[in-house]
Swiss-Prot record:
It catalyses: isopentenyl diphosphate + 2 oxidized [2Fe-2S]-[ferredoxin] + H2O = (2E)-4-hydroxy-3-methylbut-2-enyl diphosphate + 2 reduced [2Fe-2S]-[ferredoxin] + 2 H(+); dimethylallyl diphosphate + 2 oxidized [2Fe-2S]-[ferredoxin] + H2O = (2E)-4-hydroxy-3-methylbut-2-enyl diphosphate + 2 reduced [2Fe-2S]-[ferredoxin] + 2 H(+). HAMAP family: IspH. InterPro entries: LytB/IspH. Belongs to the IspH family. Gene3D superfamilies: 3.40.50.11270, 4-hydroxy-3-methylbut-2-enyl diphosphate reductase, catalytic domain. Its EC number is 1.17.7.4. Its cofactor is [4Fe-4S] cluster. Isopentenyl diphosphate binds at H41, H74, H124, S227, S228, N229, S271. This is 4-hydroxy-3-methylbut-2-enyl diphosphate reductase. Keywords: 4Fe-4S, Iron, Iron-sulfur, Isoprene biosynthesis, Metal-binding, Oxidoreductase. The gene is ispH. It comes from Xylella fastidiosa (strain Temecula1 / ATCC 700964). One of its GO terms (biological process) is isopentenyl diphosphate biosynthetic process, methylerythritol 4-phosphate pathway.
């Protein structure tokens, strides 16, 4: 039984930045430090940060007045930002810069009075934050959420000829392409972003798992169940005709999965650390793996800067 590792896999620049913001804020200010929502969607990472003193909450009313709060990599609405300011909270923003780019795009269309369509998953924190960039007081248009092609077919917008779209950054590239095609067919004058809003890390990891699936009869994706991009990786492998399972750690591997399997692919979502992948490899060796090789993949060199206050602390 041979194991093939996808490349790239695991942490992206936005996740690296978000985790580092929490760690450095704790080092700089001490505990408690509050984090609104899981800073990234990975149980192992969140548990580690809890042990360091981070307190995770879902809403700002759970944060004491004047305390320090970190916004997660998924971003927050303008209403949350206003609430934090009104309560005198010290804020460090771990929103991924690629999510911020989408937020700025939504705000720009709002100012022009254009209607806006967001392609995304209802209830996902990134979607809630992006929808919350729409300021009815500063624009006359509306924002709509579509999750699939069926939503496009039944969508009624107020301004079909004054319309734009954007996307959640962690969606399936293939699914998003199909939805965009449906939008363009129904609304021929709709405007889109200059560049695809699916983030570079999402696309690279999906390309890598597609290549992996061509050579394997089983693909294991390391990632937590609430990780959007990790779920898309497992779904993509399945669409390529390969059995695939999303696992939080090596402990979730069922030995029955690897019976009569000759090539097992392993990848990890953008919020899953390499230590979890290492654990999966060790478990596969126990189950009979004879070798591990790694695809060359697409190199990633993206690095996002920390907030200025944390950079200054490093210099000091």
């Amino acid at each position: 039984m041979k194991v093939l590792l996808a490349n790239p896999r695991g942490f992206c620049a936005g996740v690296d930045r978000a985790i580092e913001i929490v760690k450095r804020t704790i080092d700089m200010l001490g505990t408690p430090i509050y984090v609104r929502h899981e800073v990234v969607h990975n149980r192992f990472v969140v548990d580690d940060l809890k042990q360091r003193g981070a307190i995770f909450v879902e809403e700002l009313h759970q944060v004491p007045d004047g305390a320090t709060v970190i916004f997660s990599a998924h971003g927050v609405s303008q209403a949350v930002r206003r609430q934090a300011a009104q309560r005198g909270l010290k804020v460090f923003d771990a929103t991924c810069p690629l999510v911020t780019k989408v937020h700025l795009d939504v705000a720009r269309h709002c100012r022009t009075g254009r209607d806006m369509i967001l392609i995304g998953h209802a209830g996902h924190p990134e979607v809630e934050g992006t929808m919350g960039q729409w300021d009815q007081e500063r624009g006359t248009g509306r924002i709509y959420l579509v999750e699939n092609i069926d939503d496009v077919a039944t969508l009624h917008v107020a301004q079909p000829h004054h319309l734009a779209y954007t996307t959640q950054t962690t969606l399936s590239v293939d699914d998003t392409r199909n939805i965009i095609d449906a939008l363009r067919q129904r609304f021929p004058t709709i405007q889109g972003p200059k560049n695809n809003d699916i983030c570079y890390a999402t696309q690279n990891r999906q390309d890598a798992v597609r290549e992996l699936a061509r050579e394997c009869d089983l693909v294991l994706v390391v990632g937590s169940p609430n990780s959007s991009n990790s779920n898309r990786l497992s779904e993509l492998a399945q669409r390529e005709g390969v059995a695939s399972y999303l696992i939080d750690s090596a402990a979730e591997i069922d030995p029955a999965w690897v019976i009569d399997k000759h090539h097992i692919g392993v990848t990890a979502g953008a919020s899953a650390p390499q230590v979890l992948v290492d654990g999966v490899l060790a478990r596969l060796y126990e189950l009979g793996a004879t070798s591990v090789s790694e695809h060359s993949g697409k190199p990633e060199s993206m690095v996002f800067a920390l907030p200025k206050a944390l950079r200054l602390q490093l210099v000091d």
